[in-house]
Amino acid sequence: MILDTSALLAILLRETEAAAFAKAIEDADSVRISVAGYLEAAIFVDRHGDEVRRAMLDTFLEEFSIRLEPVTVQQIRLARQAFRSFGKGIHPAGLNFGDCFTYALAKALREPVLFKGTDFSQTDLLPAIEG
């Protein structure tokens, strides 16, 4: 399963979906996040979070054995195509920069995506949670 920044932040910020997202992560055989998605989450908590939330980010990834995946040339090509097909201002999915890396990782590995919102549900990727 591929973890999108939106789901990771929902957990860290204890939003409504946090418990369902944490359960999906716990139940998954493997969970990965693009290094670009990790950086996006880290920038958010560094800018908006307190010391506790900053520490929670890395602790959460460690506790749930979430793997940071490097960006490959293949993923860059897939991310570029994702923006052309589903990007902000181009398609209702409105994928942003970070979303395109999540899309590319999920597409390359053929894995479902755990995300918050409706952006990825308007693409050709499989959601990790239906709804």
Model-derived features: positions:
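General small-molecule cofactor/ligand-binding pocket signal
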Residues: 32, 67-69, 128
